[in-house]
């Protein structure tokens, strides 16, 4: 029964739970809490029901991955602050000049989150293609670090080179700043993208 749940229902349950938490809990720590909670749930499931027994990671590997996850979380927060400080002013001016500040704030948050998700994933798709197509972009972004793991698990799935965080955060930042997206919709989208990637 647990195996069937994991196979067919875990991913939708995770996404619904994360979006529900975002909608129902008003806390600045919701992102951090859901990421940690999801890592605990998936890490426990990997231990209890590993997809392959050979993939069970030694404790030292899990600890080092956990340290890297925390470091990258801090680094990604700093990238977000840097983008806010350096890009918000110029992109707001461009948005005003081109009349792009028309975001539908009155629409349901879930609809807004999926709109941002689709638009940012479209941009990210082309960035990701460029990373794989051109050696220069591959090296500049450090994308190879993401592909260096031989066994993926809940902790190392999204470990990227710190430089790649600039590329990862760029699509949502551009959309948010150009179209006047509200903080709640942008935050819900970041949670959605993160949890979809983990699960």
Go through each PLM region and give its residues.
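A well-structured
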Residues: 30-31, 95
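Short, hydrophobic transmembrane alpha-helix segments
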Residues: 18-30
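Hydrophobic, membrane-inserted alpha-helices
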Residues: 13-20, 168-174
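Membrane-helix interface linkers and caps
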Residues: 38-65, 84-101
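Alpha-helical transmembrane segments and their membrane-interface exit regions
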Residues: 36-46, 191-199
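Hydrophobic alpha-helical transmembrane segments of polytopic
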Residues: 10, 31, 35-39, 187
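N-terminal membrane topogenic signal
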Residues: 1-12
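Membrane-embedded catalytic scaffold of the fatty acid hydroxylase/desaturase
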Residues: 67-199
């Amino acid at each position: 029964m647990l195996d069937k749940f994991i196979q067919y229902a875990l991913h939708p349950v995770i996404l619904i739970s994360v979006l529900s938490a975002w909608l129902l809990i008003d806390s600045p720590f919701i992102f951090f809490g859901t990421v940690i909670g999801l890592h605990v749930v998936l890490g426990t499931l990997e231990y209890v029901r590993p997809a392959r027994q050979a993939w069970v990671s030694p404790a030292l590997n899990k600890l080092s991955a956990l340290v890297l996850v925390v470091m990258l979380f801090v680094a990604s927060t700093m990238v977000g602050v840097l983008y806010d400080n350096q890009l918000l002013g110029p992109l707001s001016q461009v948005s005003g000049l081109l009349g792009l500040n028309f975001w539908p704030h009155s629409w349901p948050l879930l609809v807004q989150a999926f709109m941002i998700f689709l638009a940012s994933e479209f941009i990210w798709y082309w960035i990701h293609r460029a990373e794989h197509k051109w050696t220069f972009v591959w090296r500049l972004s450090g994308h190879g670090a993401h592909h260096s793991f031989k066994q993926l698990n809940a902790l190392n799935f999204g470990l990227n080179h710190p430089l790649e965080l600039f590329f990862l955060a760029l699509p949502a930042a551009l959309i948010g700043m150009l179209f006047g997206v509200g903080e709640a919709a942008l935050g819900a989208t970041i949670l959605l993208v993160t949890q979809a990637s983990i699960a």
